[in-house]
Amino acid sequence: MRAISEPRIRAGVVGAGHMGQYHILAFMELWDVDLVGIVDTDLAKARQVADTYGVRAFADHRELAESVDVATVAVPTELHFPVARDLLERGAHVLVEKPMTPTLEEAKELFRIARLRNRILHVGHVERFNGAVQELRKIVERPILIESRRLGPFAPRVQDDSVVMDLMIHDIDIVLGLVDGEPRKIAAVGSSVNSGRCDVANVQVLFDTGTMATITASRATEEKIRTLAITQPDAYIVLDYTEQDIHIYKRAAQEYTMNRGSIRYRRASFVEHLKVHRDNPLKLEIQHLIGATRRRRAGEPVMPAQQDDLRSLAMALEIERMIRDGVPEVAWRDPC
């Protein structure tokens, strides 16, 4: 256990919008972290939010960089690269919200800068820190079929990214992490409903293991649904991201009976409700970054999730391109 007398971590948040304020609240909950400042190009907005929490307001992220150990980047996607680059080059460890960058080349460059500066670069795949997902990884074995649904109503504040980058990238990341094999083929369709970008998308991924994954994302559905269902040889597993809940269906017995020329089939099964420790996934993600920062400060090794981050982004970008260009199916070659 680390000594309580360790220096506190100084943190900052770049972006005082909807997502940025979630990060602010998460930092404020951590006893070993001091939230130093909040950045927004709208200085009046930054001041309003900063005053609420008794911290400093900045209009320029480069001013914040000199005062913090870690910083969250929660700005529009097209600004992720320049903001994260500036923070890394000025010595801050960085959590950049997903999607990491608009291009794979920019994402690779950020990781290069992080290595060069000996800084931690963490990408905000928050569902990795969902308690149900962490439990799921322990029980999934040889999946046959994966069915993912992330559906919800349209939010006018999110129009810069397609539904693939806004929502589906979470599920791409989780599915790729669950299958012990390589994707070989992708089929994708999508359409625009409420914005100038794709709002509904359906994707099928075939792996070299034979696993088939169907991923559906929508921001045109009035009910909010966040589920993942997995068929494997010994069980059917259903995860609810929102409830952080897992149900496992297993066959208990089956029998055939014959009565005067008719055959009846009876099958019995049992359902196991897996207890999951529920916590705020974003808070856990930020705690992970703080812990990694302390280990790096102590000279201990910190393993980045670079390959996983790049692979998820690469597939999301390819799916987005397929839908935009009307390409229904491609053979997948990992560009990472």
Placement of each model-derived feature along the sequence:
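C-terminal helix-rich "cap/oligomerization" subdomain common to oxidoreductases
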Residues: 1-5, 70-72, 288-336
